[in-house]
Amino acid sequence: KNINNEVVRSFWSEDNEKFEDGNGFEQIEPFIKNKTLVGYNNYYYDDKMLVLMMRGLKPTDLHKFNDRLIGGDKCSDIKIPAWFKSLDCMQQIGVAHPSLKQIEGNMGMSIVESEVSFTIDRPLTEEEKQETCEYCSYDIQATIEIFKLRKHSYFDTKESLLKLYDNSKAARWNTTTISANILLDYPLPKWNRLQIPEDKWKHVDELPTPAYEMWKYAESDPTYKGTYSEEIFDCDIKFAFGGLPGENVNEHWFEDVKLLDVASMYPSIIINLNVLGRATNVYQSLKEERLKIKHVDKQKSDALKIVLNSVYGNLKNQYSLLFNPLASATVCIYGQMALFDLCRRLYHADYTLININTDGVAFKDNDPNSPLRNFMDYEIIWKQWEQDWNMTLELDEFDTWIQKDVNNYIAIKDGKVKVKGAETNKYNFN
């Protein structure tokens, strides 16, 4: 089918012999050359089966490879020709790797299953052929709809990444792998210790000792996933190896709330700590280029955003060139230290902390007329913090903020509602 869901060609072969109408499997190759095929999970199944069909394998042999692929065998002996172009709509669709049938259900489509058994050992009847074609046609229709939904958000951006990398071998890679290879063509040297600059510890002198000890333990075991929670600054704060979640323990409803977010926090930390070594300068130039073109060339900007944001995840990916567990732990700890310091400064300036997340702090002013405001106003704290941590904060403001906990809240600004969390986002107020 084409993008308009119109059937442009059908291929059928009982014994892979050449039919008079020229629609046997031997006709697939000349038809698909110079075209880009789109499928769902085709990088792991359909593409390989098509290659075998074009080789002229008998149905009995095709069935054996089918069973191997479905059984989890990658069949790496099946080589995809260099001219063969395809896109896989399943690529990076989500950590759950939903099946096509699951997506059809989520899209409100009917779940159509074939009544024709996959174990028939005889030629299909005309009626069975018709039903099989209808079954395949329906799944292709669903694949077309998925492709349309992901074209701009994923495939256009991936195409921009491929232009940046300029390597034909990368066409089937996911965006995370492409991003790593844009920055490096060799494995990143691994750190043998945490590398928090000594001058940063003075800003977190109120850090709970168990949290510090937990972080230091990661030096001997980078896979350590411990957590520690404590009530501090009138918030229940959880220290771990992710964000720094925390919420006010006294109230749930707040007025006139300000939110300071760290702009591009992980990319900024990666640059500050020179995590990528020689490639850090390249990384920084990509960050600066994205800021310049953010409102001019959105597609390229989105591609650069993927490169920038994928690095932190790749530091934890053992299959990536960027794999560096202690660097990952350092970036995480550095970010939590910076957020903890911002919380500390605001709290001691008599601001009420409301919500603390991975890269931001929501707070309110208890007493705008306090003498403290002459030298501890949040704007002064803001600029001092930026100077001390070499990162940038961005301000947002809300009229009302109502929260159940750190991950479930409703924030209202100028009559518009922002919601977060499973307890709130099922409601649509706008």
What are these regions (language model features)?
Residues K1-V8:
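Entry/capping segment at the start of metal-dependent catalytic domains
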Residues S10-Y44, M49-N430:
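Conserved acidic
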